[in-house]
Amino acid sequence: MDYKTAGVDVQAGRAFIERIRSSVEATHRPEVIGGLGGFGGLIRLPAGLNKPLLVAGTDGVGTKLELAQQHQAHYGVGLDLVGMCVNDVITSGAEPLFFLDYIATGTLSPEAMAQVVEGIAEGCRRSGCALLGGETAEMPGFYDPGCYDLAGFCVAVVEEDEMIDGRKIKPGDQIIGVASSGVHSNGFSLVRKVLALTEANKNTRFGCDNKPLIETLLTPTTLYGQLVRNLLEAKVPLHGMAHITGGGLPENLPRCCPKDLVTVIDPSSWTRPELFQWLQDAGQIPEHDLWHTFNLGVGFCLVVAEEAVRDVLQVCKEQALQAWPIGQVETASPSTGERLRGLPS
């Protein structure tokens, strides 16, 4: 008996590394030292920083992976993985510096895994960060054949005196919602229950435009890193930012705001995408649960002074991203402890 008989194909692993090499190295910034193959990735801090802070984040893609694996949508979940991590760390105004990935699988499929890593590499390229290293663990008997899980790790850098942490947010500031591409990577345990209930398949269509349901659900997470970079380069004064993930607006927007302030949202200020209405109707999901599970069309929020709204909307337009003023910041009432108002209770 040998290792391959036990379920681990070392030769397939080597072929996989060679397949992804060019995609990975194409993400490398000038600060990267060396290439693939070392025990650890090496990178210098960007030149010219005085008091740099490192910002780290980690995340996965959740049970969206099951749907993606059923429909061989491997490239897209690579983009999702980067989006989930990068969109978190940029909320502090940090520049994504490098990314690491971890892939665990039952049996290594070089083609599927290469598509995943190529998606990760493309997400890193769009976000300006180096794919500095990763681990692909073949674990036969632990994961079913063809099944895999993903984890991502992103490190970003920001000057200490330029960090955005919500301290500048004040009453009267406006909240800009930036469009999501769909469900992104949260709420898929509920999505999968709805799909099972309705017996939906790859041929199922929905909405006025008769869109393919599964393809729409698997649309990759929007990457907001370039938008934030452009806003910072344009010297737009950003007071706070929030990545709208699990928990939706109610649980994520207040995270960027001081506790003595309340965010007030007007749900009529943007049009809820048809996909969420289909999910609600098909699954008979209560309105409260819908808001606390999905982004409902708003994937990222920017908190800015009122006079900066026009500039923010212009930069979003130049990035081909829809955006809307969706609310404002007010003084909180000490007696209620409310952090967010305006949404259905």
UniProtKB/Swiss-Prot annotation:
Entry GO CC: cytosol
GO molecular function per UniProt: ATP binding; phosphoribosylamine-glycine ligase activity; phosphoribosylformylglycinamidine cyclo-ligase activity
Primary localization class, coarse: cytoplasm
Enzyme Commission number(s): 6.3.3.1
Catalytic activity: 2-formamido-N(1)-(5-O-phospho-beta-D-ribosyl)acetamidine + ATP = 5-amino-1-(5-phospho-beta-D-ribosyl)imidazole + ADP + phosphate + H(+)
Highest taxon in the source lineage: Bacteria
Subcellular location: Cytoplasm
HAMAP family found in the cross-reference section: AIRS
Entry protein name: Phosphoribosylformylglycinamidine cyclo-ligase
Organism of derivation: Prochlorococcus marinus (strain MIT 9303)
